[in-house]
Amino acid sequence: GKQLPAKLASGSELRLSFPLGEDPKAATFPLRSADLRIGFRALAPESNVVVTLNGRTLFSGLPASGARFVTREFVTKPSRQPDLAEEYLHVALPNEAVIAPGQNDFRVSVVGGSKPVEVTDLEVRYDYQNDLGQIWNRVPAR
């Protein structure tokens, strides 16, 4: 069934089964970095957020102590179709071994704030070292 969006009361934990099809170890280019992006609504700045992936704590602290992006701070005028999330928390993945192809266990808990928090989306981003411009424009061998 549909896992997101999901409401999360203060002090409770949201657990998601997160399937992933991409295997960075099988990619043509080496992995430069990977991060996890989590979308929230009604996340109070004083809330303590804990993010766990496959049993490993990746982030624990105030949203402002991480890479936190508030959508309304970047958008000059309201979009005709706004994002479901009001803000995003980006968490760097230390290496590709943390997340594996197949099912992954994602957990997030929030303590603090007077209203329930809504987790709107979850995304893994891979950044590969590719020199496609250099490959495309290379000088032929003589």
For every predicted segment, state its role.
Residues 19, 35-41:
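Short edge beta-strand/loop segments characteristic of extracellular beta-sandwich folds
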Residues 39-138:
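Beta-strand-rich ligand-recognition modules
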Residues 2-27, 88-91:
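Short beta-strands within extracellular/lumenal beta-sheet-rich domains
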Residues 1-7, 135-142:
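Activation corresponds to long, low-complexity, non-globular regions
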